[in-house]
Amino acid sequence: MITSGVEPKDLAKRGESLIRQSSNRYLTTVRIAFRAKQRRFDDFDGLLEESSVKPVQRAIVELSDEQDQPDLLPG
């Protein structure tokens, strides 16, 4: 059963990949939590469109995309 826009298996794979490729699991967990907190406040401020994806799920997807495709980052 899928209750959000993210497949649970895909989310688990992305999370495992983030942890596996990190040198420090704690800092990776903190980065995910910080990004989720930012997204949560963006949702409250109306900066993001309505989404069924929870902030933690969105943070994991964003961070794994940044890790897998660093050429997409500005700068």
From Swiss-Prot:
Catalytic activity: RNA(n) + a ribonucleoside 5'-triphosphate = RNA(n+1) + diphosphate
A GO CC annotation given for this chain: DNA-directed RNA polymerase complex
InterPro entries xrefs: DNA-dir_RNA_pol_omega (IPR003716), Pol_omega/Rpo6/RPB6 (IPR006110)
Top EC category: transferase
Pfam families: RNA_pol_Rpb6
The keyword Nucleotidyltransferase belongs to this UniProt entry's keyword annotation: yes
GO biological process terms, semicolon-separated: DNA-templated transcription
EC identifiers of the protein: 2.7.7.6
Disulfide bonds: none
Domain of life of the native organism: Bacteria
Transmembrane segments: none
GO MF, one example: DNA-directed RNA polymerase activity
UniProt keywords, alphabetically: DNA-directed RNA polymerase, Nucleotidyltransferase, Transcription, Transferase
Family listed: Belongs to the RNA polymerase subunit omega family.
Protein purpose: Promotes RNA polymerase assembly. Latches the N- and C-terminal regions of the beta' subunit thereby facilitating its interaction with the beta and alpha subunits.
HAMAP family, alphabetized: RNApol_bact_RpoZ
Quaternary state and interactors: In cyanobacteria the RNAP catalytic core is composed of 2 alpha, 1 beta, 1 beta', 1 gamma and 1 omega subunit. When a sigma factor is associated with the core the holoenzyme is formed, which can initiate transcription.
Annotated protein name in UniProt: DNA-directed RNA polymerase subunit omega
